[in-house]
Structures are given as structure tokens and as C-alpha cells.
Amino acid sequence: MSTYIDYSSKIYSIYLKYFDPKDIHIYSIDEVFIDLTPYIKHYKLSADKLIENILFEILKTTQITATAGIGTNLYLAKIAMDILAKKQNINKDGLCIGYLDEMLYRRKLWQHTPINDFWRIGKGYATKLKSIGINNMGDLARYSLNNEDKLYQIFGVNAELLIDHAWGFESCTMQAIKEYKSKHISKVMAKVLPKPYSFKKARDMLKEIVDHMVLELIEQNLTCNQIVLDVQYDKESLEKVQSYNGPMSKDSYGRSIPKNAHSTINLDYHISSLETICNKGLELFDLIVNADFLIRKISLTLNNVVKNDTIKKIKEPSLFADIEQKENKNFIKEEKLQKARLAIVHKYGKKSIFKASSLENGLKINSQIGGHNA
């Protein structure tokens, strides 16, 4: 994973030679959106020629063949890359570049299948669309002319985006992306376990995840006041508990598994206390997880994350003032301990401190980057 990040950084540095960062939106570790509009005149090149030059430089610098999509809006650029460049277009120089405007999109891709090749249409949406006779984007566009209300009944507010995309429209601009600021910030860690874990072993892994996330909160001077836990069971659970006849779902391979255990617990106030967050997380785990099942994935979300110094410090007088004062002293003591851990980690590296239980869990969180082995 660290090699992947190194190459991603090298490629991004090439973009910066041509474009201002304000005109680049990093979509993922290996995809970006770039607003070419001001640069076509600046470089006196067509959009496709400018992109060719950049792809050649990427190839020369990294020996990686990159793909690109050019479109009259963000959606069409994405589709031009995902469907045309990656699956159809390789030019005489060996470069993969796709181009779409609204009319080309309708001529070339309205009949394209499967429909879940299109951005933001997953298997679930594809199944719902098929149930009303829609198999491609052309079907969806024509259906929307007389049955818009039906689409809103099925997909809610997301119907607007589906209809726009069926016609090749996209209202979101690069400027809107750059100006967007989320009202609520969350921190999420999801771990796919290397093999099916027992209840106890998965519970121990949750402790490791909480420890890692709380340390991150303290490092960034952040607090949270809500915990969301999602636990996905393994398919072998059905073999282990053959009498189970409760709710079912599918894993990423389409195999039947017991429905995920999912719930939320609110904290009394914003904190970054390892003890409190861990205890509440385990309380939630014990409450919602079936102890007889095997577990394959754990996702933990810390919600309503804010800076520690933005929290109102002065509280109303309380009958439990002595208890609260004692709790506050414990928090301060614990925070000092976690900051001492951070100081050691910063000086000697992530692997310099670990708990003995970490050796048993088979998932080395400190050796990973973004959930992948470094």
C-alpha cells in the first residue's frame, strides 16, 4: 500500500505542474477530477491534446499507463473514463482517452449494459430498475418523461440524480465541490477480518479499533459524542447455527449471510476518553451481536466530531458535582497517558508500542495504511 501511495503522489505532482490545486478534486487514491476550462486557452491546446501530454508524462515518469475521460460535466467525464477509456478506447499511441458530451452520451451509451457499469448505480439500484422494465440509461431517460413520480416513490430524493444522469446532465460543479463543507464530521474505521472470528476474538479486535481511533482523536485534539457499530457476519455462521431463520442479507460476493448487527449509542457529552468510548463500544457490541455467529467485518464510526477547544467548558451547577469533578480528573490523567503514547509513537514509529492482545488478533492495525497492509 505504501508503494501505491508513493506512485499516487508522483502522479499528483505531475498534475501540479499543469494545474492549480483549486482546479483538482481528489476523488480517490487513483482518480482525480480536473477542471480544464481555464487551461485550454492558457496552453493553446485542445482538451484531448493537453490530456495526451499529461498521460505521456505519467507513462514516462512512472511506467504506468493512465486512463482519462473528458466530458462537458463531471458525470460525463467520469463515464467517459469508466466505460469508454477503460473498456473501449485505446488510440494509436496506446493511450486510453474517452470523450463525451450530452448528445454523444445518448448515442453511444443509452443502450449500454449492464446498467450498473454507470457511476452511482449499484446492484441494488439495478435490480429495482429492472423490476420496472429499465435495463439501460435510454430506458431510464424515456421512463422519466411520463413516470417521474414513480421513480421518486422508489428512489426518494436520489431519483433526481438518476434522472439527470440518464440524460447526461450533472448539476454539481468543481466550484461546488470545493466550497462544500460538511455540517457533521465523522471518523470511520472498517476492518475486514482475515478469517471468521468468534464473538470473543471479534470483541478483542473492537478494542484494538477503538484504541487506534481514540489515539487519533487525541492527536488531532478532537472529541465525539456518538458511536455507531456495524458488524457483518461470515457465511459459515449459517452452517454453525443451522436453526437460524432470522433476517438475511448478502455479502459482497452475493452469498447469503445473517443480517448485519447495526446500532448507535449516544454519549453524555463530547469526549475523547479511551475508557469511556471503549466501554460504550463494547456495551453496544454485547447488546447487538449474536454470540453464536462468526464475524467477518467490523465497522466503527465516531460521530459529531469537533475540536476539543470548541466545546462549552462551563456547566450548570449539578448535584453530582463531586462525581463529575472526579471523572474530569480521570479524563485528564488518561489524556496525559495517551499523549505520552503519541510522543513515543512520533519518535520511534507506529510499531514502537502495542498491547499484548494485539499479537493474538492477526490484524496488525499499526502496520496498515488506510486499512491495507503497508
Sequence positions of predicted segments:
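Short Gly/Ser/Thr- and Asp/Glu-enriched loop/turn motifs at secondary-structure junctions
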Residues: Y27-E31, G71-L74, L222-Q226, F293-K297
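Gly/Gly-Pro- and Ser/Thr-rich, intrinsically disordered tail segments characteristic of DNA damage-repair
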Residues: M1-M174, L319-A374
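Acidic, metal-coordinating catalytic segment for phosphate/diphosphate chemistry
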Residues: G254-A374
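Glycine-rich beta-alpha junction loops
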Residues: T72, Y233-K235, N304
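Short, acidic Gly/Pro/Ser/Thr-rich loop/turn segments
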Residues: K41, Y75, E236-L238, K307-D309
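Solvent-exposed residues in well-ordered beta-strands and their adjoining turns
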Residues: T37-Y39, Q232, D268, N303
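DNA-contacting surface of Y-family translesion DNA polymerases
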Residues: T127-L294, T310
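Residues at or immediately flanking beta-strands
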Residues: T65-T67, V228, K297-S299
